[in-house]
């Protein structure tokens, strides 16, 4: 299945929507669309690529950095997150985790 991913960052001037299949990481799909997002490890082990899901659901079971409380608040590591529905994600939120 393909889902619509809506990325938003007022600070970065990002407001884009693109398709992402259920077996593609959101960060990878964004890059294929030419959208530059922050990342570092690409393995779900740091917080550089963190986003916050405001609508929809993702599967980020490969991640090893965020704690349960952060995930309940909607934080997501876009480098290892698969969409499970249409999603709206705030990007560039790493500083909010600390």
Curated annotation (Swiss-Prot):
Which coenzymes or cofactors are required?
A: [2Fe-2S] cluster
Q: List, alphabetically, the CDD domains matched.
A: fer2 (cd00207)
Molecular function per GO: 2 iron, 2 sulfur cluster binding; electron transfer activity; metal ion binding
Chief site of localization: plastid
List where in the cell it is found. Answer: Plastid, Chloroplast
Residue intervals of the 2Fe-2S ferredoxin-type domain: 3-95
Could you say which residues bind [2Fe-2S] cluster here? 41, 46, 49, 79
Gene Ontology terms describing biological process:
electron transport chain
Q: Name one GO cellular component term.
A: chloroplast
What the record notes about the co-factor is: Binds 1 [2Fe-2S] cluster.
Q: What does this protein do?
A: Ferredoxins are iron-sulfur proteins that transfer electrons in a wide variety of metabolic reactions.
Which family would the database say this protein is a member of? Belongs to the 2Fe2S plant-type ferredoxin family.
Know the name of this protein? Answer: Ferredoxin
Q: Which organism is it from?
A: Porphyra umbilicalis
């Amino acid at each position: 299945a393909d889902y619509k991913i809506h990325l938003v960052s007022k600070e970065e001037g990002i407001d884009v929507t693109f398709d992402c299949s259920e077996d593609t990481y959101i960060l990878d799909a964004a890059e294929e669309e030419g959208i530059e997002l922050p990342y570092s490890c690409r393995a779900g082990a740091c917080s550089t690529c963190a986003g916050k899901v405001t609508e929809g659901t993702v599967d980020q079971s490969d991640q090893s950095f965020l704690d349960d409380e952060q995930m309940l608040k909607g934080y997501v590591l876009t480098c290892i997150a698969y969409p499970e529905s249409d999603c709206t994600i705030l990007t560039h939120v790493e500083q909010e985790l600390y």
